[in-house]
Amino acid sequence: MVTERQQDILNLIIDIFTKTHEPVGSKALQESINSSSATIRNDMAELEKQGLLEKAHTSSGRMPSVAGFQYYVKHSLDFDRLAENEVYEIVKAFDQEFFKLEDILQEAANLLTDLSGCTVVALDVEPSRQRLTAFDIVVLGQHTALAVFTLDESRTVTSQFLIPRNFLQEDLLKLKSIIQERFLGHTVLDIHYKIRTEIPQIIQRYFTTTDNVIDLFEHIFKEMFNENIVMAGKVHLLNFANLAAYQFFDQPQKVALEIREGLREEQMQNVRVADGQESCLADLAVISSKFLIPYRGVGILAIIGPVNLDYQQLINQVNVVNRVLTMKLTDFYRYLSSNHYEVH
């Protein structure tokens, strides 16, 4: 059982340690804790006994353990605070014209990695929830073509493919017609299901040879099922993570899955501190926060760093970036949905 004073001591030690990265002694706490040095030492000993503090090898001071950071995140972290002193700099960073969603997400990721010194990942709306709103096929040459998908009337995904040997021009038109009739207006999850259930039967009515058509469907839609993900500060992993974690970030789709699995449907924010799960991120801290993408759903910002982070400062910064990012995205999508020639 941690008393109120012991919790104050733990919070203060974490605050000092994350700024100095030096063990903290009882004398450093006396100005802020209204108790004698002996009482503070006794409380520190009790916190150590409970596994929340640990001794330093080169000093008589104490530093927070992984369990101490976990306790702090669970009991003391304020998720609603804003870093008001940094609002201006963050707003200024977004004061530019962006031409696509990925550029806005990249700016948010770059900004957070500059502020934190950590690795940052930004995710678009979950692919399965996005809706196909337009489709076309562009012939590039005698044997190649490009499938062009528009999701949520704003995001474009392309897939180049080799036209099957037995395909005629009219077969490409059939393919385009089937996709437009059967898939437009449906979510990516629905489309994934239809490709495996309805499409095999439908193409038998339109094509003499069906095997290569099924394979073609699988190929051109594969990219649409992938996460839209941007990263910043991957090199920072070399300062606090092992090689396996660094190499894990060469697989963006797996990174996206790991981040989504760490944030439940009903959660808007979460902090994982060395949760010990079988993961390349098990020994790291992951701060995840959802942000609104107007008219479409929610995205996720995730900061990946060492356990000994200044969690409160990072949460404050993430909160500000989230709010400014949502404002910028609202303006971006309002422009997209308006009549271009009426916008001044």
Curated annotation (Swiss-Prot):
Signal peptide: none annotated. One of its GO terms (biological process) is negative regulation of DNA-templated transcription. It comes from the Bacteria. GO terms for molecular function: DNA binding. InterPro entries: GAF-like_dom_sf, HrcA, HrcA_C, WH-like_DNA-bd_sf, WH_DNA-bd_sf, WHTH_HrcA_DNA-bd, WHTH_transcript_rep_HrcA_IDD. Keywords: Repressor, Stress response, Transcription, Transcription regulation. PANTHER family: HEAT-INDUCIBLE TRANSCRIPTION REPRESSOR HRCA. Belongs to the HrcA family. Negative regulator of class I heat shock genes (grpE-dnaK-dnaJ and groELS operons). Prevents heat-shock induction of these operons. This is Heat-inducible transcription repressor HrcA. It comes from Streptococcus pneumoniae (strain Hungary19A-6).
